């Protein structure tokens, strides 16, 4: 094997915790190497060490057999290590050329920027990627996929020989992801080594050559893609074999009482008027393509988005929800798609995040919060939901994605909310944490909670939902239940004009 990158015995300690313990990693020239592990396994810490952001406490880094010590990120770049983070670092109002050469502009003899030369170099880079990018347009006008290719181009313009791709498909459509994989294969052909981090095992099997798994900051093993399967990888990641990600569905209760009846919901002027109902103890899926109206309908439902028409009944009584505060008072809670920016105050503790929707619950002498009672209640919810953290006063930004999602759920349970809207609840969460979230959702419905599940992942919709409302162009095309819930049927209604006869099903 023509090894270009060798990490040996990498150990990293932070106060009170050993984040990495003796990690070994070998990556060959022209190889796409997957790095797998649950959130908190140490992937990000290892990549930050490779990029010069953290120094290792023990261990060595070698590039082309030459030992390297990176004092900072610039040292790693100079050694040929590039990274494309999940969150882009582009300047929105600058074009692709200016973003590529920001801070290291090429200059002519008079010290002026040589724009023509930089533009030619940028065109060569994108030709190398096989991508057409408008070099004159501000990058904010480019698609998400094109912005990602600009990030990759930045790394290549710095002569990156080892390229780290951190969850690169998280915001891409399937077509854009396929285009990215084509670019990765072309870079592989050119001899660039890539470390590919993804929670999507189907992507790993599609594009990677070898796979290294970390668990709890330790090296578990490296395997050839062709010599393993999904079950074996999951067992390596979580330390146990997960036979079924989705818990069994209970029998469909067609006579269950409706807790929420939406008699008319029209999000935009001249748009379709939808009707649906949510039953006690069920998971109702909102399925459809991006832009189909799933999320906008849910936001309009709770008053977080304006609606032209909104008529609904809560447990048989007419209710007006003019905003999220009204929804909160009515016992309806939203777990938003972006938990870090919309669902949590990440700089706050678990206790403060759990209590924020119900500050009066543990008040004493009218004005003072009983911090001890608040901590006890938070500790009970942490135990009930399986939140892995030392204390209720642990900061939320130190938790994994799965544990952060559980904190959002705990906040609503602390308020005794009985109707929960989950918007993309497992996005960015590893496979073990997904199984825990799914089990938790079923435990909630068994206690009489009702859930609306909005998801772009068809297996999640099919595996978790008792009924599914399929949206297309803002309209509910059909409400499916029982054996009718399968991927083909959902996609047929989501993409075709064949409207279901029961699209006003209640």
From Swiss-Prot:
Q: Keyword Transport: yes or no?
A: yes
Q: Which SUPFAM superfamilies match?
A: P-loop containing nucleoside triphosphate hydrolases (SSF52540)
Principal localisation = membrane
Q: What is its EC number?
A: 7.5.2.7
UniProt binding sites for ATP: 37-44
Main EC class the enzyme belongs to = translocase
| Family statement | Belongs to the ABC transporter superfamily. Ribose importer (TC 3.A.1.2.1) family.
Query: Can you name this protein?
Result: Ribose import ATP-binding protein RbsA 1
- Say which species the protein is native to: Burkholderia thailandensis (strain ATCC 700388 / DSM 13276 / CCUG 48851 / CIP 106301 / E264)
Gene that encodes the chain: rbsA1
């Amino acid at each position: 094997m023509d090894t270009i990158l060798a990490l040996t015995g990498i150990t990293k300690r932070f106060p009170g915790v050993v984040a990495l313990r003796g990690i070994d990693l070998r990556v060959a020239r022209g190889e796409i190497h997957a790095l797998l592990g649950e959130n908190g396994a140490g992937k990000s810490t290892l990549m930050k060490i490779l990029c010069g952001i953290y120094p290792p406490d023990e261990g060595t880094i070698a590039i082309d057999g030459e030992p390297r010590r990176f004092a900072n990120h610039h040292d790693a770049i100079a050694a040929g290590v590039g990274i494309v983070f999940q969150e882009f670092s582009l300047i929105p109002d600058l074009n692709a050329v200016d973003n590529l050469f920001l801070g290291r502009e090429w200059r002519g003899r008079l010290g002026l920027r040589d724009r023509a030369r930089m533009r030619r170099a940028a065109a060569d880079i994108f030709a190398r990627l096989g991508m057409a990018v408008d070099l004159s347009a501000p990058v904010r006008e480019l698609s998400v996929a094109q912005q990602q290719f600009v990030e990759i181009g930045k790394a290549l313009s710095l002569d990156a020989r080892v390229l780290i791709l951190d969850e690169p498909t998280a915001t891409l459509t399937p077509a854009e992801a396929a285009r990215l994989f084509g670019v990765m294969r072309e870079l592989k052909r050119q001899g660039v080594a890539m470390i590919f981090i993804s929670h999507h095992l189907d992507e790993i099997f599609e594009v990677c050559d070898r796979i290294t798994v970390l668990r709890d900051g330790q090296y578990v093993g490296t395997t050839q893609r062709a010599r393993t399967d999904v079950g074996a990888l999951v067992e390596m990641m979580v330390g146990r074999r997960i036979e079924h990600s989705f818990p069994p569905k209970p029998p469909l209760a067609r006579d269950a009482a409706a807790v929420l009846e939406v008699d008319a919901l029209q999000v935009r002027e001249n748009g379709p008027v939808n009707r649906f109902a949510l039953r006690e103890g069920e998971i109702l899926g909102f399925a459809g393509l991006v832009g189909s109206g799933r999320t906008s309908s849910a936001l309009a439902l709770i008053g977080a988005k304006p609606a032209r028409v909104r008529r609904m009944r809560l447990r048989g009584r007419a209710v007006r929800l003019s905003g999220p505060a009204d929804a909160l008072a009515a016992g309806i809670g939203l777990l938003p798609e972006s938990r870090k920016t919309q669902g949590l105050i990440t700089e706050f503790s678990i206790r403060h995040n759990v209590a924020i929707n119900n500050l009066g619950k543990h008040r004493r002498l009218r004005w003072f919060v009983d911090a001890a009672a608040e901590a006890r209640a938070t500790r009970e919810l942490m135990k009930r939901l399986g939140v892995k953290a030392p204390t209720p006063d642990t900061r939320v930004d130190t938790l994994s994605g799965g544990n952060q999602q559980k904190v959002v759920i705990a906040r609503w349970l602390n308020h005794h909310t009985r109707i929960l809207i989950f918007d993309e609840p497992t996005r960015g969460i590893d496979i073990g944490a997904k199984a825990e979230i799914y089990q938790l959702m079923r435990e909630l419905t068994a206690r009489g909670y009702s859930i609306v599940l909005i998801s772009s992942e068809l297996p999640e919709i099919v595996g978790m939902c008792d009924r599914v409302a399929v949206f297309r162009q803002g309209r509910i095309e059909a409400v499916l239940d029982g054996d009718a819930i399968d991927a083909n049927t959902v996609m047929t209604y989501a993409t075709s004009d064949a409207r279901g006869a029961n699209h006003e099903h209640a």
